[in-house]
Amino acid sequence: MSRARPEVAVGAVVVRDDRLLVVRRGHGPGAGEWSVPGGRVEGGETLHEAVVREVWEETGLEVVVERFLGWVERLGGEHHFVILDFCAGLLEAEAVAVAGDDAAEVAWVPVHELSEIRLVAGLHEFLTDHGIIV
């Protein structure tokens, strides 16, 4: 059993034209795997502020949080994350995403093709359970 203290993190589910915004993680946990943009909530920061900041840092895109989608808990090794995922919309519809911070790569992947890429553990099921993948 891990003795790691739970850390609060956020994720941003951003869909445009039936494509999901995903980043390839540059660092662990999940290095090399695709995930939605997100990360740890910093002290003094609201959940919505954390979503906006993480998307900006990892993709260069500006978003507005639309609604809470759901939460997951990820335990492994030295990590224990409680991740709260939010649907977010782009402030500028035609903005171009550019990988930054700990994102090695950024892409818009058609929702129906998500099963063909290496997603972080549990993400495909989460997106299916919450109606993003149908």
Model feature map: region roles:
Residues 72-95, 130:
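Active-site-adjacent beta-strand/loop module that shapes the phosphate/pyrophosphate-binding cleft
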Residues 19-57:
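Conserved Nudix-box catalytic region and its N-terminal flanking loop in Nudix hydrolases
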Residues 62-70:
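A short coil-to-beta-strand element that immediately follows conserved catalytic motifs
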Residues 9, 35, 85, 107:
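Conserved beta-strand segments that form the floor/walls of ligand-binding pockets within enzyme
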Residues 12, 68, 86-88:
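A structural signal for short, well-ordered beta-strand segments
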Residues 1-20, 40, 71:
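Conserved N-terminal beta-strand and adjoining loop/helix that marks the start
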